[in-house]
Amino acid sequence: MTLGSCCCEIMSSESSPAALSEPDADIDVVGGGSGGGELTARSGPRAPRDVLPHGHEPPPEEAEADVAEDEEESGGCSDCEPRALAPRGAAAAAGSPGPGVQAARGATGPGPGPGPPSGGAATRSPLVKPPYSYIALITMAILQSPKKRLTLSEICEFISGRFPYYREKFPAWQNSIRHNLSLNDCFVKIPREPGNPGKGNYWTLDPESADMFDNGSFLRRRKRFKRQPLPPPHPHPHPHPELLLRGGAAAAGDPGAFLSSFAAYGAYGYGYGLALPAYGAPPPGPAPHPHPHPHAFAFAATAPCQLSVPPGRAAAPPPGPPTASVFASAASAPAPAPAPGSGPSPAGLPAFLGAELGCAKAFYPASLSPPAAGTAASLSTALLRQGLKTDAGGGAGGGGAGTGQRPSFSIDHIMGHGGGGAAPPGSGDGSPGSPFAAAAGPGGQAQVLAMLTAPALTPVAGHIRLSHPGDSLLSSGPSFASKVAGLSGCHF
């Protein structure tokens, strides 16, 4: 080892003790001063020169000689100082890299701080579902259409073109759109026209569901729309409380409480047990056809309901006063005309039988009260001449009888008062007090009039013999009154 190298090693150990603080540090100087030597750090620092590794100090003569040589060669060893300071710069560069190293590192690799995401990462992120319900989406699609109606496929096409989320998941939500169209009352189905070919029906909005969304915002819906039932065709201006109660019961869920507006009224426009007014004034129409019977027309005019009498059926006439007599109608009724081509019947038998039956039916109910005065005077004499025949006596009928005529079944003949019959005991032909006295001569009609005008409960002066010229056919038999006792007091 030369003296110069020793001197440089001593100076470097004194000037940079921190750089050589590690144990067993060794610095080799390669090359001379002019050659630009290189300093290399070894595994451990080297001990200073004054401390020998073998543990003995050099002699003082050698130490002085070394100091002198160092002073002489101080100029030549000046280039050793930068080489001695080089490890300090290298250590600093190794501890904290300079700005150039940091710039190089930033160019080669990404920094530890967060950076903006690239475009590929944004496309891989999932799409956000729109905050609208299916009802709102359907309403949007229908409102934007020109005719305000769309089919199911057109609604799905609008939603897919408007929102990318539904475009990617198209097959999944199509059934939800179909269910909302069918289950919500705010959507109305319109059948397709016959001349408009295609598949599916049209869907539109109910006119009453315009305020379904709050302030026109599709994000908030006020309430579920319910379609109201149609009102009756002719609502009553002032409904009866009974009808209101029926309507409330029907709304409460009682199906039997609700009655239609027309079924709530009877056949004559009145309620069952309630005097309800009619719905309104009847429409003006033609006047009812006048009925030939004046009483029936008056009854139809005074009826509480506006009903017309059917043409084939006449209304029953109102009951008359109790004092009216049935003979008034009999007097006003025309006499039955005989059949054409037939001669007058003997003694008017057919007409008499019909008149007798008619008078017998109407006489007894009306005979309970005394007839009105002057009623019998209006009795037609033609009826008496045609239907009544008085018998002049029991023997007179038997003398003029013919064998080929029809026998009579009158009460007098059955009682045995015909021709040849014996009179009941205690009753003579000329007895005026007997009810079975025969009407003699032309006074028989007067007795008939007297009987008709007299009260029904008073006995008549003479009995009318309604007999026939053929009474003699049965007169040969025994008398019926002779076998039965106590029949003398019977009027008929």
UniProtKB/Swiss-Prot annotation:
Phosphoserine: modified positions:
96
**Gly residues: which segments have biased composition?**
394-403, 416-431
One MF annotation (Gene Ontology) recorded for this entry: DNA-binding transcription activator activity, RNA polymerase II-specific
Q: Where is the composition biased (Low complexity)?
A: 13-22, 83-107, 323-334
Report residue spans for region: Disordered.
13-125, 309-344, 394-441
Q: Where is the composition biased (Acidic residues)?
A: 60-74
Swiss-Prot/TrEMBL keywords: DNA-binding, Nucleus, Phosphoprotein, Transcription, Transcription regulation
Coiled-coil boundaries: none
Quote the InterPro entries the UniProt record gives. Answer: Fork_head_dom, FOX_domain-containing, TF_fork_head_CS_1, TF_fork_head_CS_2, WH-like_DNA-bd_sf, WH_DNA-bd_sf
User: Which ranges does the entry annotate as DNA-binding region?
Assistant: 129-223
Primary residence: nucleus
List localization entries.
Nucleus
CDD domains in the record, alphabetically? Answer: FH_FOXD1_D2-like
Q: Keyword check for rRNA-binding, yes or no.
A: no
Q: List the disulfide bonds.
A: none
A GO term from the CC aspect: nucleus
Q: Report, as the record phrases it, the tissue specificity of this protein.
A: Expressed at high levels in the ventral region of newly formed somites, in sclerotomal derivatives, in lateral plate and cephalic mesoderm and in the first and second branchial arches. Other regions of mesodermal expression include the developing tongue, meninges, nose, whiskers, kidney, genital tubercule and limb joints. In the nervous system it is transcribed in restricted regions of the mid- and forebrain.
Where are stretches of biased composition, namely Basic and acidic residues?
A: 47-59
The record describes the protein's role as: Probable transcription factor involved in embryogenesis and somatogenesis.
- The identity of this protein, by name, is Forkhead box protein D2
Q: Which organism is it from?
A: Mus musculus
Q: Which gene encodes it?
A: Foxd2
